[in-house]
Amino acid sequence: MSEPRRIYSIDIFRGMTIALMILVNNPGSWGHVYAPLLHAKWHGCTLTDLVFPFFLFLVGASMRFAFVKWHYYPSPKFYKHIFWRTVSIFMAGWFIHAYPFIVQDWDWSSFRYFGVLQRIAIAYGISALLIIRYDFKQLLPIISGILIFYWGLLWLGGTGDPYGLEENLVRKVDIFLFGEKHLYGGFGIPFDPEGLLSAIPS
């Protein structure tokens, strides 16, 4: 297996994204935060909203070079590598959500199943399988189809305002499968921005 070389543009972009993430998570004073360092309340997009997509982009870009040593050949060893990498990233997300583990009276009934690392794990695992099975020309219609399918799913499955916070299908599916207590509550109502159904376009 040939070893992949370092791609400095990816390393630099990763460093810039991490620096932006640190700035967003630690603005100094939450009472005086520049608007671009806050998430859009729902519709819209700020610089802060791009941090997570940047990380997903980096995962995809890195795969292109990391998989060179496997020659993109779908061998059992390659599948095993993808499986364990996916599981380890997903479990790291659970590890972070569960910490600290020995706090007295820890309430597991409100444990959040999904999050940033879990979303990255799902996106990595599925994308890796697609990359080693299909070439670029085949992937274009697949990616377009996934996005159109997700858009139609939200439109057909939602009620009232299918793209709004309260009545979208993503929220309904997560509540039905996991319950309100296991979802992120930062929007004032139970809604997980890294939930199960919303992993499709990622």
Describe these PLM feature segments.
Residues 1-78:
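N-terminal signal-anchor module of multipass membrane proteins
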Residues 136-202:
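Long hydrophobic alpha-helical segments that form multi-pass transmembrane helix bundles
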Residues 14-16, 59, 92, 114, ...:
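Short glycine-rich loop/turn motifs that provide flexible caps or phosphate-binding loops at active sites
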Residues 49-54, 69-97, 101-104, 109-127, ...:
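Transmembrane alpha-helical segments and their boundary/interface "anchor" motifs
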Residues 16, 40, 114, 120-123, ...:
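Surface-exposed loop/turn and secondary-structure junction residues enriched for glycine/proline
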Residues 20-27, 85-89, 169-173:
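An acidic intrinsically disordered interaction segment
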Residues 27-46, 100-113, 162-176, 181-191:
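Membrane-interface interhelical loops and short amphipathic "cap" helices
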